[in-house]
A protein has these predicted regions:
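Bacterial N-terminal signal peptides that target proteins for export
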Residues: 1-9
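Hydrophobic h-region of N-terminal signal peptides that target proteins for export
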Residues: 10-20
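Small-residue (G/S/T/A) turn/hinge positions that recur once per unit in extracellular repeat modules
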Residues: 97-99
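Short, flexible, surface-exposed loop segments at domain boundaries
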Residues: 21-91, 103-155
Length: 155
């Protein structure tokens, strides 16, 4: 095979890889549609968003959070924006078998979380629910008990 043909075939093979690498990054405010019900419970959602991806045929938003405390099956976390500022503090209850994803992508039982653990929390655009991964079959729901954001600001 001559050199020109090899170069042409190599360039054509690289085109799909180049296009995939240049797929537009989804934006937290432009590309996510938060429902009114969700925004009522999580008014700082847009500010707390760190990433939006498409997985399993739907958009998922990623929130970063730091564990403030865990007592029994109640978890209080600070949601952190992309500039590392706390934008909300909320308390959730969780199923005893629930698992979470740490910022190093390791899985950990929610019941084993400690103060300072950094979490990656996912939510699908189509419904309210917090998940360890962008896949509803892989995660357990966490139930919002209280939005402590204003209470924390007063302290």
């Amino acid at each position: 095979m001559n050199i020109a043909l090899k170069l042409t075939l190599g360039a054509l093979a690289a085109v799909p890889l180049t296009c995939a690498a240049q797929a537009p990054k989804l934006n937290c405010t432009k590309d996510m549609s938060y429902s009114a019900e969700f925004l009522e419970k999580f008014p700082n959602a847009s500010a707390a968003c760190n990433e939006v991806i498409e997985a399993n045929g739907q958009k998922w938003v990623r929130f970063n959070a730091v564990v403030k405390s865990r007592e029994d099956h109640h978890l209080t976390v600070k949601f952190i924006d992309s500039h590392h500022n706390a934008v909300a503090t909320m308390t959730f209850s969780f199923d005893p078998t629930a698992r979470v994803t740490l910022d190093d992508h390791q899985q950990k039982a929610a019941a084993s979380l400690e103060e300072g653990d950094k979490l990656l929390i996912w939510m699908p655009e189509s419904r309210i629910g917090l998940y360890a991964k962008p896949d509803p079959s892989q995660g357990k729901h966490f139930t919002l008990l209280s939005d402590d954001t204003n209470k924390q600001e007063e302290e």
